[in-house]
Amino acid sequence: MSIDQSTAAKVAKLARIKVEQDALPALAAEFNTILGFIEQLNEVNVDGVEPMVSVTPMRLKRRTDGVSDGNQQAKVLSNAPDAREGFFAVPKVVE
């Protein structure tokens, strides 16, 4: 696959990058160089290689899903300008 100047201009427009008309040939050449490197990856034999996400084994620590009130009600309501009966009190905005 080869990138021409019109494709390079389209990519620049999609990326919201202003590229002058005289810089398009160089941009197209850079895109072609990048695509060449990517094509080299297609030549690598990866048969039998297990896909991996990280070079170090990482596991997420799991915890049980439990519902709680957070035990923060008094602390949260202390910041409210008006709190009544454990709730935020706000002025009526709809008639």
From Swiss-Prot:
Catalysis: reaction(s): L-glutamyl-tRNA(Gln) + L-glutamine + ATP + H2O = L-glutaminyl-tRNA(Gln) + L-glutamate + ADP + phosphate + H(+); L-aspartyl-tRNA(Asn) + L-glutamine + ATP + H2O = L-asparaginyl-tRNA(Asn) + L-glutamate + ADP + phosphate + 2 H(+)
Gene3D superfamilies assigned: Glu-tRNAGln amidotransferase C subunit, N-terminal domain
Keywords of this entry: ATP-binding, Ligase, Nucleotide-binding, Protein biosynthesis
Molecular-function annotations in GO: asparaginyl-tRNA synthase (glutamine-hydrolyzing) activity; ATP binding; glutaminyl-tRNA synthase (glutamine-hydrolyzing) activity
Any one biological process term the GO annotation gives: translation
Role noted for this protein: Allows the formation of correctly charged Asn-tRNA(Asn) or Gln-tRNA(Gln) through the transamidation of misacylated Asp-tRNA(Asn) or Glu-tRNA(Gln) in organisms which lack either or both of asparaginyl-tRNA or glutaminyl-tRNA synthetases. The reaction takes place in the presence of glutamine and ATP through an activated phospho-Asp-tRNA(Asn) or phospho-Glu-tRNA(Gln).
UniProt name for this protein: Aspartyl/glutamyl-tRNA(Asn/Gln) amidotransferase subunit C
Source organism of this protein record: Ruegeria pomeroyi (strain ATCC 700808 / DSM 15171 / DSS-3)
Lineage start: Bacteria, Pseudomonadati, Pseudomonadota, Alphaproteobacteria, Rhodobacterales
